[in-house]
């Protein structure tokens, strides 16, 4: 699902008050972290991820890897926080999008 700019703007507004659900530390993206990320994204649909590793390129790579792994879309990235979205197939809170 490709989101329009209006939809992304709405999701950014909804995501503003959220706190990061997953934190990627210096250990990077382990299998257990990816599994936890997948289950959290399935539950929340819209969530923040904090990436506390290295420089900007490493953070970009980690967020891009999470998006590719889970088929999520990056809505916004500010510093070391990424806002990711993946709509549920059934019973989505974001059915109007």
Task: Name what the model sees in each region.
Residues 1-97:
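Positively charged, polar, low-complexity stretches
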């Amino acid at each position: 699902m490709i989101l329009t700019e209006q939809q992304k703007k709405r999701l950014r507004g909804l995501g503003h008050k959220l706190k990061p659900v997953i934190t990627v530390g210096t250990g990077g993206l382990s299998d257990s972290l990816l599994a936890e990320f997948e289950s959290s994204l399935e539950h929340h649909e819209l969530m923040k991820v904090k990436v506390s590793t290295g420089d900007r390129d490493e953070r970009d790579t980690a967020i891009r890897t999470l998006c590719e792994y889970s088929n999520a879309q990056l809505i916004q990235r500010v510093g070391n926080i990424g806002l990711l979205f993946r709509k549920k197939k059934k019973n989505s809170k974001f059915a109007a999008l």
